[in-house]
């Protein structure tokens, strides 16, 4: 497994996670993911670590409230969230992972 890092646009929220280099990316057709062209990379909770910016995270829920969408209070980017489809994983926005 390889360690990756990423975060929001302004850099206030940062995270690290471990994943196989051949991990599969998913597209979602829910209303919020389609609007922002969110590319999903599901990472188990124990392989994810929020490294900075916890106090700058704003949570948004809708409909069933089972998915927890986390946004940066400063720049508005959703770099990861808790999907309802994978309760044991976070969904990392692939476009928010560092090169």
Regions found by a protein language model. Give the residues of each.
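A short Gly-Trp-Pro
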Residues: 1-7, 12-99
């Amino acid at each position: 497994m390889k360690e990756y890092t990423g975060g929001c646009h302004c850099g206030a929220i940062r995270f690290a996670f471990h994943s196989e280099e051949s991990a599969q990316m998913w597209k979602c057709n829910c209303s919020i993911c389609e609007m922002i062209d969110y590319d999903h990379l599901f990472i188990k909770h124990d392989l994810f670590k929020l490294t900075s910016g916890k106090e700058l995270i704003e949570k948004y829920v809708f409909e069933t409230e089972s998915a927890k969408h986390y946004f940066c209070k400063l720049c508005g980017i959703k770099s990861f969230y808790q999907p309802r489809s994978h309760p044991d994983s976070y969904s990392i926005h692939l476009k928010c992972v560092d090169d």
